[in-house]
Amino acid sequence: MDINIIEDKNNALLNRHEVKFDATFKGSTPSRLDVRGKLAAMLNVPLELVILQKFENTYGMSAANGYAKIYEDAARMKVVEKEYVLKRNELPEAEVVEEAGE
């Protein structure tokens, strides 16, 4: 999967970066977790601070566009984001257990 960042805007009021991007991929549409992981690696931020707000596939093509928010700290993220968005973007239990064991 290749991700091309279209816009990276700093939102100082909410202590976050807002990123608009295009993604191209082969095969099936990647999972939200895969996209978040790739964005976190590209921007050199922890996966837990990346909120994938929108990820829409382009009909008939192996491409998608999306919108993500990267917070500076988890406390601010929990204050700003709605509960369902946090739940949609939380890590699976296996991932959390692995990180705690390291």
Curated annotation (Swiss-Prot):
Keywords, comma-separated and alphabetical: Ribonucleoprotein, Ribosomal protein
Record-linked InterPro entries: Nucleotide-bd_a/b_plait_sf, Ribosomal_eS24, Ribosomal_uL23/eL15/eS24_sf
Protein name as it appears in the record: Small ribosomal subunit protein eS24
Domain of life per record: Archaea
GO MF annotations in UniProt: structural constituent of ribosome
Matching Pfam families: Ribosomal_S24e
Organism in which the protein naturally occurs: Methanococcoides burtonii (strain DSM 6242 / NBRC 107633 / OCM 468 / ACE-M)
Range of residues in the leader sequence: none
Gene Ontology cellular component annotations, sorted alphabetically: ribonucleoprotein complex; ribosome
GO terms classed as biological process: translation
Family affiliation: Belongs to the eukaryotic ribosomal protein eS24 family.
